């Protein structure tokens, strides 16, 4: 319990003169020590020359100054001096010094006090929300119980006290003052958490809370938690944390209430304080009822948790049961329990398959909604009360700490009771449904909603599901393999001719044996049908069982159609099995052929291994020098194919008749045109590297004189023959040459005649 400065100031006015002097001196010395260690703005009052005088003067003049300021509706720093140790040591809120010289600052601090008064409302709202979240966490979480604390920022009920209680509060021991001083040192980390909590509050919660006037200075903060929550928190903690002392918890708890204490110490008590006493009694009664409900819920949840762990062991043993029976039994139990949990208590009755599916969907939806609300409340409570996670168990009190849940209005108590009832009903029904269900799949389905709060329980249930599914799959696969081996119509031989031990055909059975087998199958079917009728009713048969019946019927019909009833016209025995090979004798010694091929390869290798005079050339790697010369020769041949890098790697063309004629025409180019003179070509023969081409005029410059593509020729000779001027010149030259030859011939004839005449 933390007694603030305001309580001491009121008791000083009503007590004797001796008590007025004794108690303030002790508090003044403690206040001066704390000012020197933690405060920045108290230098004007703590000077070494006026230490003792400031103690007495500050206490005598405190109440008078407060009355003047409150009458003017203005806030001042003297309220903070008389409100408690926390107002002096708080660093994050700006401290305004009010001295004789600097009284102008009083008008500017009126806004800050209004803000502080407005911020009290979210604290009440957060306390109400914490109560609701705590109740939901006790009911919903089996494995995780999150104890939360209920802080009362303004204890209106404790403001009215008897004269005897006030006299006792005046004489406070030094130990309590030292505890309050220790708690005041921890204000700095707590103020940041309190500011964050104020930012997280919703604006709608401000309108719900009401602040009644009265003396709001004395604050008694007690944690609202039951013995069961203390036990669960101790079990959740490690052993090292259980044995440690709870000094830090009490210190931080006291610091929270020092931090949250308001500073309006000058207000007088009104007639509403008498009403607050009655309100406090009603609140305590409500809190006691809530704690009893929480105890009962926690005890029931612990019992149900033990039952669930026992059911897990039963589920592992019963994992080989079929899915259809589990669904039928679980659905009957769920329907009966659902009707029993309703307030009307209707008689139980069996539903058809579509109604059952609809009911399962509704159950899934209901459980999903419950889990979502629980998760949101859990997150909200943990986010807003993260710094008070260890206060419920660290308080150390059992039933002594429970009934002091002060600082809650009548509206809050009425509102906090409603969601508790609403939230506990679906959770209880859900847990009661999971108690009686012994079949594995449906129990896992229902318990999965509860296991969302703990990772370990989720992992265990997932492994159970996977083990059951794998077991069913393996059993079905083995059954299929056995059925395939026993009742196979044909067998595929992957290695024909080698495995002669297997029978590749079905032998013809006698008709008597076939009839006996059919009778046995019919008797087995009748026994199975009788067992199914005794175990399951006709209304609870699933579609899966019907499909299995159809498959078994079709399978029996197919088995009757054996090779004896069908005449293919071929005898499989004569053909050597399913592989119709007319040369069966050649395929039988297949292994011998493979061995013969291997022996031939060995013989060839042995023959090559014999030493002969030429074995060095055959089986030896050529030396490095020879290979180097060969590479040089190959490079030379490649170079000779082209004219070199100077001619851009021009290759030597193949000499054809057309190219030879072109080369001859180019040699005689001096006689083609008399107007042009060419140097005589000294080469004899044809060149090795050459390319023949024509120079084409630019069409933009010589458009009319250019040769179109249609008139262009492939070779030089064809172009010369197509040229008209060349043909005209060629004809004239040809006629001249022929005339000279004729003249020369006539002259020779005349000379011969003269010789004969002589």
Swiss-Prot record:
Q: Which keywords fit this entry according to its UniProt record?
A: Coiled coil, Isopeptide bond, Nucleus, Phosphoprotein, Transcription, Transcription regulation, Ubl conjugation
Point to the regions of Polar residues compositional bias: 1-21, 155-172, 231-255, 321-353, 431-440
Region Disordered, as annotated, extends over 1-176, 231-277, 312-353, 377-480, 501-552, 621-647
The domain of life is: Eukaryota
Reply yes or no: does the keyword Cell division apply: no
Q: Which GO terms describe its cellular component?
A: chromosome; nucleolus; nucleoplasm; small-subunit processome
From the Swiss-Prot or TrEMBL record, give the protein name: Deoxynucleotidyltransferase terminal-interacting protein 2
Low complexity: compositionally biased ranges: 128-143, 447-456
State any GO BP term from the record: ribosomal small subunit biogenesis
Point to the regions of Basic and acidic residues compositional bias: 377-387
Please give the residue positions where the record annotates the modification Phosphothreonine: 612
Organism name: Mus musculus
The subcellular localization recorded is: Nucleus; Nucleus, Nucleolus
What does it do?
Regulates the transcriptional activity of DNTT and ESR1. May function as a chromatin remodeling protein. Part of the small subunit (SSU) processome, first precursor of the small eukaryotic ribosomal subunit. During the assembly of the SSU processome in the nucleolus, many ribosome biogenesis factors, an RNA chaperone and ribosomal proteins associate with the nascent pre-rRNA and work in concert to generate RNA folding, modifications, rearrangements and cleavage as well as targeted degradation of pre-ribosomal RNA by the RNA exosome.
Q: Pfam families in the record, alphabetically? A: Fcf2
* Post-translational modification Phosphoserine, affected residues: 17, 133, 137, 140, 173, 183, 229, 240, 248, 255, 324, 330, 476, 512
Instruction: Report residue spans for region: TdBR region.
Output: 550-607
């Amino acid at each position: 319990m933390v007694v603030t400065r305001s309580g001491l100031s009121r008791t000083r006015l009503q007590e004797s003169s001796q008590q007025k002097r004794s108690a303030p001196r002790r508090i003044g010395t403690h206040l001066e020590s704390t000012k020197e260690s933690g405060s920045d703005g108290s230098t004007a009052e703590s000077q070494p020359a006026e230490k003792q005088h400031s103690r007495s003067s500050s206490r005598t003049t405190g109440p008078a100054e407060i009355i003047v300021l409150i009458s003017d509706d203005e806030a001042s720093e003297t309220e903070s001096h008389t409100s408690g140790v926390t107002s002096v040591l708080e660093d994050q809120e700006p401290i305004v010094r009010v001295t004789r010289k600097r009284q102008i600052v009083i008008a500017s601090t009126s806004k800050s006090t209004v803000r502080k008064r407005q911020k009290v409302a979210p604290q009440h709202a957060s306390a109400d929300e914490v109560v609701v979240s705590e109740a939901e966490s006790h009911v919903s979480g089996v494995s995780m119980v999150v104890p939360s604390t209920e802080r009362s920022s303004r204890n209106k009920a404790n403001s009215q006290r008897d004269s005897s209680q006030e006299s006792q509060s005046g004489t406070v021991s030094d130990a309590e003052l030292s505890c309050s001083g220790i708690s005041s040192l921890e204000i700095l980390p707590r103020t940041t958490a309190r500011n964050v909590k104020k930012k997280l509050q919703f604006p709608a919660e401000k309108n719900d809370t009401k602040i009644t006037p009265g003396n709001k200075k004395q604050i008694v903060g007690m944690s609202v938690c039951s013995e069961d929550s203390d036990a669960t928190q101790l079990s959740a903690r490690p052993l090292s944390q259980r044995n440690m002392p709870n000094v830090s918890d009490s210190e931080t708890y006291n610091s929270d209430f020092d931090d949250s204490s308001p500073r309006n110490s000058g207000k007088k008590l009104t007639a509403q304080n008498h009403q607050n006493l009655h309100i406090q009694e009603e609140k305590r009664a409500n809190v006691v009822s809530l704690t009893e409900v929480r105890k009962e819920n926690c005890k029931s949840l612990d019992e149900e948790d033990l039952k669930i762990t026992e059911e897990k062991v039963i589920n592992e043993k019963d994992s080989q049961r079929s899915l259809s029976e589990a669904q039928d039994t679980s659905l009957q139990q769920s329907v009966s329990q659902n009707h029993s949990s309703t307030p009307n208590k209707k008689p139980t009755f069996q539903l058809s398959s579509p109604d059952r599916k609809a009911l399962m969907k509704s159950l899934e939806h209901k459980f999903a909604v419950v889990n979502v609300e629980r998760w949101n409340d859990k997150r909200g409570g943990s986010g807003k009360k993260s710094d008070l996670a260890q206060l419920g168990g660290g308080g150390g009190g059992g039933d002594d700490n429970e009934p002091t849940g002060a600082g809650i209005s009548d509206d809050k108590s009425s509102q906090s009771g409603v969601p508790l009832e609403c939230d506990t009903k679906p959770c209880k029904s859900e847990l009661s449904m999971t108690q009686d269900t012994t079949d594995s799949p449906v129990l896992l389905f229902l318990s999965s909603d509860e296991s969302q709060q703990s990772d370990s329980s989720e992992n265990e249930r997932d492994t159970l599901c996977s083990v059951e599914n794998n077991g069913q799959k393996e059993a079905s696969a083995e059954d299929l393999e056995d059925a395939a081996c026993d009742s196979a119509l044909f067998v595929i031989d992957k290695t024909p001719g080698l495995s002669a031990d297997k029978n590749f055909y079905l032998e013809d059975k006698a008709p008597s044996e076939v009839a006996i087998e059919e009778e046995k199958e019919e008797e087995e079917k009748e026994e199975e049908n009788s067992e199914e009728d005794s175990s399951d009713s006709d209304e609870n048969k699933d579609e899966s069982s019907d499909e299995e019946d159809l498959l078994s019927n079709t399978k029996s019909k197919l088995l009757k159609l054996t090779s004896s009833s069908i005449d293919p016209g071929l005898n499989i025995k004569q053909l050597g099995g399913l592989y119709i090979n007319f040369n069966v004798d050649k395929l039988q010694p297949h292994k011998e052929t493979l061995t013969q091929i291997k022996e031939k390869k060995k013989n060839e290798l042995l023959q090559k291994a014999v030493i002969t005079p030429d074995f060095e050339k055959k089986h030896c790697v050529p030396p490095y020098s020879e290979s180097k010369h060969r590479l040089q020769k190959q490079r030379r041949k490649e170079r000779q194919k082209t004219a070199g890098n100077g001619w851009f790697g021009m290759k030597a063309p193949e000499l054809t008749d057309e190219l030879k004629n072109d080369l001859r025409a180019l040699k005689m180019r001096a006689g083609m045109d008399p107007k042009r003179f060419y140097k005589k070509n000294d080469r004899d023969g044809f060149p090795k590297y050459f390319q023949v081409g024509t120079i084409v005029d630019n069409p933009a410059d010589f458009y009319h004189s250019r040769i179109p593509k249609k008139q262009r020729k492939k070779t030089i000779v064809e172009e010369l023959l197509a040229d008209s001027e060349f043909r005209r010149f060629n004809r004239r030259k040809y006629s001249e040459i022929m005339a000279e030859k004729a003249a020369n011939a006539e002259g020779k004839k005349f000379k011969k005649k003269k010789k004969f005449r002589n």
